């Protein structure tokens, strides 16, 4: 009888342990298996770079409740005509390019070349041939973020200078993960180099 009781206790204990580990296994699968794997990119300064959000992959927003008649009438009013698109290229006064192209090429090779090519082919980022004066988000075959598509205008030296300080601050939602060039001389040199590239 003592042996039978002992065997019963062992069986109950084993069952409880198996149940516990089964519960832990199911819980961990439900908590962790449905989440996508993520990695955190780190910039040259050692700080984490924020990932961009692909707006196309986001779930559609729920439709809003029916609006009152006054708001509906306002919405039905004709919208202002959209601004015309910028020209494909604008001419840039060479006097506005003040940097050293040779130093800019060196800086480009260290900080930009991993994502941007200068052979007319796209990579992680669009190619930069003819970028000076080109309309934003217009490189054929490159899939731009909605934020960059809405950043309408042309890449003048002044506009590139502002953008290169901090791309994510200038165009929130851009896919470009580069933290920026804080030094004005570096930006001027890179812009001078980019101006030497053919269209």
UniProtKB/Swiss-Prot annotation:
InterPro entries: Cyt_c-like_dom, Cyt_c-like_dom_sf, Cyt_c_1A/1B
Topology term for the membrane: Single-pass membrane protein
Region (Disordered): 69-93
Biased composition (Low complexity): 69-80
Biological process annotations from GO: photosynthesis
Mod. after translation: Binds 1 heme c group covalently per subunit.
Binding site for heme c: 112, 115-116, 148
One annotated GO molecular function: heme binding
Segments traversing the membrane: 7-27
Top-rank lineage group of the source organism: Bacteria
Pfam families: Cytochrom_C
Keyword annotations from UniProtKB, A to Z: Cell membrane, Electron transport, Heme, Iron, Membrane, Metal-binding, Photosynthesis, Transmembrane, Transmembrane helix, Transport
Subcellular location: Cell membrane
GO cellular component, one term: plasma membrane
Stated role: Electron transfer pathways that operates during photosynthesis.
Protein name per the record: Cytochrome c-type cyt cy
Organism in which the protein naturally occurs: Rhodobacter capsulatus (strain ATCC BAA-309 / NBRC 16581 / SB1003)
């Amino acid at each position: 009888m003592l042996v039978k009781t002992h065997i019963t206790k062992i069986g109950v204990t084993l069952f409880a342990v198996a149940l516990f580990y089964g519960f832990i296994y199911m819980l961990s699968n439900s908590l962790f298996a449905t989440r996508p794997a993520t990695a955190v990119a780190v910039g040259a300064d050692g700080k984490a770079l924020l990932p961009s959000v692909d707006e196309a992959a986001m779930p559609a927003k729920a439709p809003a409740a029916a609006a009152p008649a006054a708001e509906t009438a306002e919405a039905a009013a004709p919208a202002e005509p959209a601004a015309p698109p910028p020209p494909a290229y604008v001419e840039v006064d060479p006097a506005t390019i003040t940097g050293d192209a040779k130093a800019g090429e060196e800086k480009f090779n260290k900080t930009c070349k991993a994502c941007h090519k200068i052979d007319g082919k796209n990579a992680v980022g669009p190619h930069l041939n003819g970028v000076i004066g080109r309309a934003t988000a217009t490189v054929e075959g490159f899939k731009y973020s909605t934020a960059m598509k809405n950043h309408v205008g042309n890449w003048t030296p002044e506009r590139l200078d502002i953008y290169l300080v901090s791309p994510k601050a200038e165009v929130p939602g851009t896919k470009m993960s580069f933290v920026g060039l804080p030094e004005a001389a570096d930006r001027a040199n890179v812009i001078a180099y980019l101006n030497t590239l053919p269209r």
